[in-house]
């Protein structure tokens, strides 16, 4: 019986490792890429209160050149009801205060949030985690208003979150968001 030569085995293993590395790199590029834009005129801009929707935002962070935004959109109108949202950023130039007419959409993954479901009595399919590479966003004189683009049940709405983000070289320069007491007050 012929034994395979070490060189052939090594080459096959190297090819598998390189292929796995390429697949991982493609997944990473996909995860931090933009997902297009949403025209503001096609959506109703709301804070969610009239629809019994409560945005809960966690502090965003930058890690290895990627901006991460995590939070949840609570549906208080029914105990069971999945939320499917995308995170959007509306750029506003700080010097003139002019906002763009479109929200830049981020890659958004939905996640379960058991602790929020128990606290507010909503479905646990309410969480999200969005990410984008910093290189796709302007830095310095642009402030981004974070919105949640919700098309659940055929509705087309952008829900304001009370959070704004400004990027500088090396991280976040400014983050403003509603205090937890305001979010809890909004939920009642």
Question: Which positions does each model-derived feature cover?
Answer:
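N-terminal secretory signal peptides that target proteins for export/translocation
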Residues: 1-3
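Basic, ligand-binding patches in group-transfer machinery
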Residues: 6-188
């Amino acid at each position: 019986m012929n034994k395979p030569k070490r060189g052939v085995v090594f080459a096959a293993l190297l090819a598998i490792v390189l292929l796995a590395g390429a697949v991982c790199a493609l997944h990473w590029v996909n995860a931090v890429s933009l997902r297009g834009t949403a025209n503001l005129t096609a959506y109703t801009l709301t804070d969610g209160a009239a629809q019994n929707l409560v945005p809960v935002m966690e502090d965003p962070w930058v890690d290895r050149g990627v901006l991460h935004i995590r939070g949840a959109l609570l549906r208080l109108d029914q105990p069971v009801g999945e939320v499917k949202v995308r995170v959007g950023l509306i750029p506003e130039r700080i010097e003139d205060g002019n906002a763009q007419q479109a929200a830049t959409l981020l890659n958004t993954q939905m996640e379960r949030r058991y602790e929020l479901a128990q606290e507010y009595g909503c479905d646990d399919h309410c969480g999200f985690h969005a990410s984008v590479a910093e290189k796709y966003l302007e830095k310095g004189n642009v402030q981004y208003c974070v919105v949640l683009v919700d098309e659940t049940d055929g509705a087309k709405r952008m829900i304001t979150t009370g959070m704004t983000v400004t990027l500088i070289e090396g991280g976040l320069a400014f983050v403003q968001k509603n205090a937890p007491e305001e979010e809890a007050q909004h939920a009642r």
